[in-house]
Amino acid sequence: MLFDSHLHLDQLSDENIQQTLAHSKIIGMLAVSTNLNSAKKLLNLKQTYPKKLYIAAGFHPEQQLPSLEEQKKLFQWIDEHHSSISAIGEVGLPHYSKRENPNLDYVPYIELLERFILIAKKWDLPLNLHIVHNDVEIALELLQKHNIQRAHFHWFKTDEKSFQKFFSTPYFASLTPDILWNSKTQYVAQHLSLNRLMIETDSPWQHEGFERAGISEQLLAVLQKLAELKSLPLHSVQKQILLNTQQFYRL
């Protein structure tokens, strides 16, 4: 059985959404939101597929910051619907936007991330994070400042120094199909304990070599490569990864 721990389900076509949720090999998925409208759409979908679809509410950091009024509405919506969501996400820092625009002011993004951390703590919800490379240390400092125990770093990749700091925390990381060729993803897979790993597709993102592959095919490819890197039987890796995800998100 397969569980996708991070995807943008609301960005798929209606037909693809139905096919994905009806797939017999997919036992569940954690769908993250990019803004308030995204979260609302996911909640409507969840009401149709309550046993397979779990959702997260947040604001994707690789976009223009929401206005204070938009932030207020999003936080209010989370307060009103916290019992229906399984995580706060996707939230984090705009690493790729900063790469394109070195003058981007990070301060308001850090402040917004801290607000999301506080609301996650308020409702005892885990965080599904967009945090990579040199943003890892910033995020770890915020998480530890607020004594956060459940944080999931999606599509995790960073330098060795930041990885060592991450390694000493209780936090989880998830792997995408780029484990097949990305040395940084392979490093995470090899050095992080199996009981701190999850798998994901970040669908509808198209991974190299998987442009026509469905979600189940992508997840299975990640598991197979992970089993190879860990020198473990595929069935035991698959069982542990599913258990990790269910326990982390309290499903």
UniProtKB/Swiss-Prot annotation:
Record field: transmembrane: none
SUPFAM superfamilies tied to this protein: Metallo-dependent hydrolases
EC number: 3.1.-.-
Top-level EC class: hydrolase
InterPro entries, per database record: DNase_TatD-rel_CS, Metal_Hydrolase, TatD-like
Keywords of the record: Hydrolase, Metal-binding
Amino-acid positions noted as binding a divalent metal cation 1 in the UniProt annotation, renumbered to this chain: 6, 8, 90, 202
Record bears the keyword Mitochondrion: no
Signal sequence, start to end: none
Cofactor dependency: a divalent metal cation
Binding site for a divalent metal cation 2: 90, 130, 154
Disulphide-bonded residues: none
Cofactor: record remark: Binds 2 divalent metal cations per subunit.
Coiled coil feature spans: none
GO molecular-function term, one example from the UniProt record: hydrolase activity, acting on ester bonds
Similarity comment: Belongs to the metallo-dependent hydrolases superfamily. TatD-type hydrolase family.
Protein name from the UniProt record: Uncharacterized metal-dependent hydrolase HI_1664
Species name: Haemophilus influenzae (strain ATCC 51907 / DSM 11121 / KW20 / Rd)
